[in-house]
């Protein structure tokens, strides 16, 4: 889904980072410095190394265009839900979970 959001609404959304909603926000490392908002929808557990690990098997990703936000009070965004499996790595006591998803942006430059 592609849509638009007012600048104030976006800033309010990005300031919310409640543990209860399991929503996370971080800057995407691309040349446009867009923003990504990730929401965990469902959990599933898988056994690994005789321990149960939780993976996010369904996530919702919304990407907000920072470039448009700078020019106008509207910000373009694209939203999609993914079913994905995370891979895990461990370094000492630090665990990381990663996954790769492809979000196709056909109409990113559409007008509001």
Language model regions located:
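Viral virion structural and adsorption modules
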Residues: 1, 5, 106-112
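Small/polar-rich, solvent-exposed N-terminal microdomains that initiate assembly or binding
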Residues: 1-47, 51, 66
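Short proline/glycine- and acidic-rich turn/helix-capping motifs at secondary-structure junctions
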Residues: 29-32, 90-102
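Short, charged/polar, Gly/Pro-enriched secondary-structure boundary elements
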Residues: 43-47, 105-110
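Short proline/glycine-enriched turn/loop segments at secondary-structure junctions
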Residues: 49-50, 88-91
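Oligomerization/assembly interface segments of phage tail-like spikes and tubes
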Residues: 55-66, 95-108
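Short, conserved charged micro-motifs
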Residues: 68-74, 110
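Short beta-strand and beta-hairpin "edge-sheet" elements
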Residues: 73-88
């Amino acid at each position: 889904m592609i849509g638009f959001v007012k600048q104030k609404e976006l800033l309010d959304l990005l300031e919310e980072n409640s543990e209860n909603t399991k929503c996370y926000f971080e800057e995407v490392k691309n040349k446009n410095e867009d923003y990504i908002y990730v929401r965990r929808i469902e959990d599933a557990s898988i056994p690994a190394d005789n321990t149960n690990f939780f993976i996010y098997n369904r996530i919702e990703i919304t990407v907000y265009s920072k470039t448009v936000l700078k020019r106008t009070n509207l910000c373009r965004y694209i939203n999609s839900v993914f079913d994905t499996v995370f891979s895990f790595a461990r370094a000492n006591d630090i665990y990381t979970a990663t996954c790769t998803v492809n979000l196709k942006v056909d109409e990113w430059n559409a007008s509001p």
